[in-house]
Amino acid sequence: MTDQLPASTLRLALVVGGLVLSLLLGFGVGRLNSGPSSAAGSALAAGGDHTHPPGAGEPGVGGLAVTSAGYTLTPLGGEFAAGRAGEFRFQIRDAGQRPVTRFAIVHDRPLHLIVVRRDLSGFQHLHPGMAADGTWSVPLTLPQPGVWRAYADFTAVTADGTQVPVTLGVDLVAPGGYVPRPLPAADRQATVDGFTVGYEGSPAIGVDVPVRFRVRAGATTPTLEPYLGAYGHLVVLREGDLGYLHVHPDTELAGDAVAFQLTVPGPGRYRLYFDFQVAGQVRTAEFTLSVP
């Protein structure tokens, strides 16, 4: 007669065996699941883009948000009467809402303030002063009623010395009847105060393209003076959302031309504002660029 285990002993053996099998399967599944997940997480942490965005949205397009990269543009008041001299006061605050007071000097200034109406008219390039408490202030006149966009373009310096370039944007309002001006047609030549300015180069989507500006005064070539660390300064704004494109200038003249490297993020129309200095006076030539 064959020996048989008691029923209770058999049940206990089955339970223990099931537990052991579950543990072994769980260990194997855990090894399979944890390996790739850990590797992916490490790759994201180590290989992610550590360059802070200039604002929000596409790479190279800034000024679309009031907060980005842990910094916030905080106006201290913002009521303006069209055509009346006023003052714009603001702070750049960190993630803890503390005013930032350490900025790197970029293009000869710690902060550049660009102001333009939403129809891309009335361009102003200003350089505010900062008080010890981190409050920036600058005289500002909004000449026409409407909604205006103010851009703060700066590079903050963190406690460990890291430099964080950011461009933030905020709307300012001058109450009154707003009549938008149509954007001028695309043209490679503009005239300002007797100077004729033209540019060469055909910006393409996603490609760094050289763009060169030449200034003429009648039949002569005026002597361009250094301005903001180069021989000219270029701001490019996108029609529609007023995205602010970052442009890299060449510090030296290319013959008699002022050269920049420009990348456009997509099709549409853009407004180019080229600042140049002659005989101590800064002027701005404006162009419309159409990208198919």
Tell me what each language-model feature is:
Residues 2-3, 28-80, 155-205, 209-216, ...:
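Extracytoplasmic/periplasmic copper-protein system
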Residues 4-18:
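N-terminal Sec-pathway targeting helices
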Residues 14-28:
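Hydrophobic membrane-insertion alpha-helices, especially the h-region
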Residues 68-132, 140:
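The feature marks the first
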Residues 85-98, 150-152, 207-220:
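Beta-strand-rich structural segments
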Residues 122, 131-137, 253-259:
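Aromatic sugar-binding surface patches on proteins
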Residues 130, 137-144, 264-266, 276:
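Residue-level recognition of secondary-structure-to-loop junctions
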Residues 146-150, 268-272:
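Exposed beta-strand face motif in extracellular beta-rich ectodomains
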